[in-house]
């Protein structure tokens, strides 16, 4: 049995699986300005490998997937049925964390922060 954390959530109606290539649009938590870039998500065994390229900087992360079963949110190994992905990432000396949820229109919406920041920023992934 996989390790899982359970939370009560609403059901999601779109097709699952965060694997793919996406256009990224987000908000910088420090300046409030908008940024754009790309992100690629692939499965790497039981985890996800997530690589962002934004404004000439590469961020590399490892993620866990999540599904809804019996009205409960279960976090565990990467799976094509995942409707959410939780990611820890690094770039040089910078580290951070992020969480994204599949939307009905096929986009992935989430929030992220980085080590030491008191702020949270929003980001949307658009399938390419």
Sequence positions of predicted segments:
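Cleavable N-terminal signal peptides
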Residues: 2-4, 14
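Central antiparallel beta-sheet cores of small beta-barrel/beta-sandwich binding domains
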Residues: 17-128
């Amino acid at each position: 049995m996989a390790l899982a954390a359970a939370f009560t959530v609403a059901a999601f109606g779109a097709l699952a699986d965060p694997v793919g290539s996406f256009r990224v649009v987000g908000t910088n938590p420090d300046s409030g300005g908008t940024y754009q870039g790309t992100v690629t998500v692939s499965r790497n065994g039981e985890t996800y490998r997530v690589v962002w390229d934004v404004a000439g900087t590469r961020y590399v992360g490892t993620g866990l997937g999540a599904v809804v079963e019996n009205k409960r949110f279960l976090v565990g190994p990467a799976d094509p049925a995942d409707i959410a992905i939780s990611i820890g990432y690094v770039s040089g000396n910078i580290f951070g964390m992020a969480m994204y949820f599949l939307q009905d229109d096929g986009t992935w919406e989430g929030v992220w922060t980085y080590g030491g920041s008191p702020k949270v920023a929003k980001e949307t992934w658009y399938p390419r």
